[in-house]
Amino acid sequence: MQRLKHGLLQAAGWLFYLSLLMGLAAALPTSIFDSQSKNFIFLIGAVGIWRYSMGITHFVRGMIFLYIVYPHLRRKVRKLGSAADPSHVFLMVTSFRIDALTTAQVYSSVIREAIECGLPTTVVCSLVEMSDELLVKSMWAKANPPDRVKLDFVRIPGTGKRDGLAYGFRAISRHMPDDRAVVAVIDGDTVLNEGVVAKTVPWFQLFDNVGGLTTNEFCEVRGGYIMSEWHKLRFAQRHINMCSMALSKRVLTMTGRMSVFRAKVVTDPEFIADVESDSLNHWRLGTFRFLTGDDKSSWFSLMRLGYDTFYVPDAAINTVEHPPEKSFLKASRKLMYRWYGNNLRQNSRALGLGVRRLGIFTSIVLFDQRVSMWTSILGLTVAIIASFKYGGAFLLMYLLWIGMTRLILTLLLSLSGHRIGPAYPMILYYNQIVGALMKIYVFFRLDRQSWTRQDTKLSRDMASFQGWFNTWSSRTMTFSAGTIFVAVLLTMV
């Protein structure tokens, strides 16, 4: 009955969306394509060629990897058999301020995987609270794992995830793992699907230079319908982009929810230092440490140390998402601020590694991340200007174009294996516009960081003048950049 109700609601949602598109089409005057609109169409088309060519390229590459390349590679891994088994598996879980129910789900799945993978395994628990340790010990005693499965606790101060990871990596170093050992780094809100360890650990024997790989994600959201759909859409987009970048062995982030590394990587003092105390020397904002973005730091460290990165699309995990605010608008903006800040803090120095290290396609993708904050809002800005100059029909034309293209993009996302819903087209456009505005805002404020789960913010300890200068120079540059952007478009439309 519940399934039928859900299906009917989905169908009603799609019918409502299609009705909106038909209403927009009916409202358009026949004179919309006269000579007055040539500059409008040229600008929208020129930017569209760049944006859609990047999207289509990612999609085609992703489908080639998912349905052609990866199945071939998986057959090669299976032929290796037990020769691809690592000597030891470390499953390291970091937990802080996560509710007991989620913690129990996470450790239940981790202990199950440690037992069922059939390999010598050590579960490393990087914990802050004693209550979590008591819970894990109780679950461990109940599971009664075989002797080849060990348990190791690392007590850490509640000073952030980076410190928790570094303490855990040093604890693994004390086990003195050999070159065939691997380490899975798992977040405290990540529930492992069955067989995820067995599906991820053999790849390091197939690819000698892969230093780390990451996994496919699905989610359970403790929030409303729109918040849930928003997260699910992001994971569907992530899946295609990961597949695309895996084709070049240049996956752009070692996702903190679950990634697997060679043990010799996470025990490398340089790698530990990169994750624990990563920093950026900015020409205007000075030198500051990274509070968040350990997944980006680990990726950059792998690139700098000369390793490749990979993605295993059929190794899935389920994350339990706790929105930081009850309001969708507030929660999504807060999460975007953190995610895009992490992305942009890594972007410029990643490009500094050079085309020879990154490859041509990866360099283009990183460059696109920098310009997309402006190209994403160009169409809407031009449509608004044109509607003031020539009439509101131009805005209707733009909205119809957006509605049709986002519908097509949503249907294409279904090929990723993730479910789609009728809210996806509108959420896609919300992400484009609000995401671009958040990127512009954070681009000029890279030194401002905070966690969404815990009340931890970056303390700069700057002199009063430096703090004043950073604040006002950020505001001035944001206003100047926005003004120049609009002024240029006003002269062109």
UniProtKB/Swiss-Prot annotation:
Q: Which InterPro entries match?
A: Nucleotide-diphossugar_trans
Question: What EC number(s) has UniProt assigned to this enzyme?
Answer: 2.4.-.-
Q: Does this entry carry the keyword Protease?
A: no
Please tell me whether the keyword Manganese is annotated for this protein: no
Which cysteines bridge via disulfide bonds? none
Its placement in the membrane is given as: Multi-pass membrane protein
Keywords attached to this Swiss-Prot or TrEMBL record, sorted alphabetically, are: Alginate biosynthesis, Cell membrane, Glycosyltransferase, Membrane, Transferase, Transmembrane, Transmembrane helix
Q: Which GO terms describe its cellular component?
A: plasma membrane
The family assignment reads:
Belongs to the glycosyltransferase 2 family.
What this chain does, per the record? Possibly a processive enzyme that polymerizes GDP-mannuronic acid.
Protein name per UniProt:
Glycosyltransferase alg8
UniProt lineage:
Bacteria, Pseudomonadati, Pseudomonadota, Gammaproteobacteria, Pseudomonadales
Gene giving rise to this polypeptide: alg8
